[in-house]
């Protein structure tokens, strides 16, 4: 498809933001090389990062879009191998954006526990204690199914021996959920490194109280 004609302006704007956020994952140390992937839903189309292309090389002409079943809508590059993962999330949630990374501390935690203990009140911002989806080969329908279950009533989860996945109503929110999860994993690893103390954890009631406050958070 001609990138100067026939591409909606809304898609072009969304692609620009997608590329900026993709580059931010590298700058913030959440991915290495071409690992990780991002997508954003625009109407009935999903814009997604391509497979194996360094984010600093992505240009407007590289815009890549598929439909909700993964069929090509625009672009000539192959989509990320994790497309099934993204499609599963859009199919099972109201997500408008998805961010997948190989963040160091989060990936380390994914090898240690089945659920990230509620060590910080911002656990509530992700819907509750963050689950770890069982390991499955990247890009597989099995991994997509495990992730769908781990994300039930959550906006982020860990992928065993793999990384993180988070979604949001905007790309910015999905990225913030990703960064928050990586920070909490770093916090948990730091706290559990003590040989003399055990980290204090929050109760369900604690998290419910925070959820209520977060619902009214921000400027009116």
Model features per residue range: what roles?
Residues 1-220:
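Glycine-rich flexible loops
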């Amino acid at each position: 498809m001609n990138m100067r004609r026939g591409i909606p302006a809304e898609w072009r704007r969304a692609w620009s933001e997608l590329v900026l956020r993709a580059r931010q994952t590298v700058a913030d140390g959440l991915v290495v090389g071409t690992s990780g992937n991002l997508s954003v839903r625009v109407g009935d189309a999903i814009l997604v990062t391509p497979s194996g292309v360094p984010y600093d090389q992505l240009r407007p002409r590289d815009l890549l879009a598929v439909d909700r079943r993964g069929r090509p809508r625009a672009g000539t590059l192959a989509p990320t191998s994790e497309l099934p993962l993204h499609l599963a999330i859009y199919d099972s949630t109201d997500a408008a954006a998805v961010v997948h990374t190989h963040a160091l501390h989060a990936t380390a935690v994914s090898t240690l526990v089945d659920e990230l203990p509620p060590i910080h009140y911002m656990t509530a911002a992700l819907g509750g204690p963050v689950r770890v989806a069982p390991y499955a080969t990247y890009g597989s329908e099995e991994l997509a199914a495990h992730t769908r279950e781990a994300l039930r009533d959550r906006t982020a989860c860990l992928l065993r021996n793999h990384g993180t996945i988070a979604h949001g109503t905007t790309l910015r929110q999905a990225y913030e959920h990703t960064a928050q999860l990586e920070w909490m994993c770093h916090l948990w690893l730091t706290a559990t490194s003590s040989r003399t103390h055990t980290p204090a954890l929050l109760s369900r009631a604690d998290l419910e109280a925070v959820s209520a406050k977060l619902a009214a958070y921000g400027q009116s």
